């Protein structure tokens, strides 16, 4: 077992080395100029992070949920997680896409209600299987 664990650590360590992005100084400058969010990632994964972020943002503009509603969902999540950066961004985007103040307030209230109920269930150790049975 000890030899297996040593081999596993070795293999995982090698994979981590090969998973690193090769980025020239020119590419790094271009990626950093492309998006201020690219400054959040280490150079070793800068290309991969940029590709992931670009694809992730496509969920808003090209996903099966329309863009306004996607931002309202993200706003609710941002409010629940108390993200000072995400909240103003998603409010701005939702408004740009035509969301009303009423829709924004509703999205935040839904998130608050989910958090409240989750806290009540979790804190009172409500039986999960009994809850699932109630939903049938």
What are these regions (language model features)?
Residues 49, 88-104:
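Iron-sulfur (Fe-S) cluster-binding segments and ferredoxin-like electron-carrier domains
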Residues 72, 103-109:
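Beta-strand segments within the central parallel beta-sheet cores of soluble alpha/beta enzyme folds
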Residues 73, 77-89:
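Short, thiol/selenol-centered motifs that function as redox-active sites or metal-ligating centers
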Residues 57, 74, 91-95:
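Amphipathic alpha-helical segments within well-ordered protein domains
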């Amino acid at each position: 077992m000890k030899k297996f664990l040593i081999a596993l650590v070795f293999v995982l360590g090698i994979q981590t080395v090969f998973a690193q992005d090769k980025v020239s100084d020119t590419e790094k400058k271009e990626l950093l100029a492309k998006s201020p969010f690219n400054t959040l990632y280490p150079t070793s994964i800068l290309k991969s992070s940029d590709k992931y972020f670009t694809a992730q943002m496509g969920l808003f503009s090209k996903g099966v949920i329309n863009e306004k509603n996607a931002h309202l969902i993200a706003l609710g999540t941002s409010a629940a997680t108390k993200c000072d950066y995400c909240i103003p961004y998603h409010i701005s985007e939702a408004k740009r896409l035509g969301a009303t103040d009423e829709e924004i307030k509703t999205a935040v209230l839904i998130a608050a209600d989910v958090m409240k109920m989750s806290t009540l269930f979790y804190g009172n150790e409500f039986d999960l299987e009994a809850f699932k049975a109630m939903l049938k």
